[in-house]
């Protein structure tokens, strides 16, 4: 009886992919081969692929069996529940034990013999898949048991909610009108700020209020920034400047020391007490237009007390004498020229 499902090969025969050839067809292939029929003729006659016929005949000649699969069957299972239990016990006693040490201990304790002892790779796979998760879960449970209960911390900003438990002081915040009440288990530590002031943004007022409510000791509260004005400070005396005594300011200005390398404010000398600059050297009336190098003095930005805008250093240039000499020389040259003509 042919199967009702399968595929058709090149010869027109039906086969099921992944399934072994039925035993009846296997036996018929062997019988035809013993009659002296060639494998190619057996393949055409039974509509079985040539490779399948050759493989079945080769296995029959080697082992004498027509059954599919391994001859001796699969290896018996060695990782029995008893072996896994002993491996778990060894691992719990010594978490740093190696797989080869577990194998030797199984043999030493008589749990397994040399024929059914699991291999090192099998023990490693058991430790990784079956015992590894249980060991991690046990460590996590023990860690949770020994872990102390976290103390509720102060929220940095009452705008955001934190996973820490809500303290009793934070739960005392009244609910704004028109907003439905929120249960204490899901309520936020603080309500939304009423303004965009520095105090509300940073949460200074809420933190200090919470500390003062939960602490038995008295702690000063931080006042609102808007309440800090100039009216809260004491009025300054009429003889004071910006709240400081004039006498103290005068003493500091009089005896104050200037930084190194800079003169003090009171050490400057007035311009009237300074001596005038020395008079420059006289220029001969018969010299051409020139001036001594010492006469070129770099002027300052301020004017001398006895000087003018043209002579800020109170040193007059003898320009009249020089110009008179030049004029006499010009007149003499003109007279000589006229007499020569």
From Swiss-Prot:
One Pfam family here: PAX
Annotated compartments: Nucleus
Gene Ontology MF terms: DNA-binding transcription activator activity, RNA polymerase II-specific; DNA-binding transcription factor activity, RNA polymerase II-specific; RNA polymerase II cis-regulatory region sequence-specific DNA binding; sequence-specific double-stranded DNA binding
Name by which UniProt lists this protein: Paired box protein Pax-9
Alphabetical GO biological process terms: cellular response to growth factor stimulus; endoderm development; face morphogenesis; negative regulation of DNA-templated transcription; odontogenesis; regulation of odontogenesis; regulation of transcription by RNA polymerase II
Annotated region (RED subdomain), positions in chain: 82-130
Assigned keywords, A-Z: Developmental protein, Disease variant, DNA-binding, Nucleus, Paired box, Transcription, Transcription regulation
Region (PAI subdomain): 7-63
Species this chain originates from: Homo sapiens
Main localization category: nucleus
Domain of life: Eukaryota
Main function: Transcription factor required for normal development of thymus, parathyroid glands, ultimobranchial bodies, teeth, skeletal elements of skull and larynx as well as distal limbs.
PANTHER family membership: PAIRED BOX PROTEIN PAX-6-RELATED-RELATED, PAIRED BOX PROTEIN PAX-9
InterPro entries recorded: Homeodomain-like_sf, PAIRED_DNA-bd_dom, Paired_dom, PAX_fam, WH-like_DNA-bd_sf
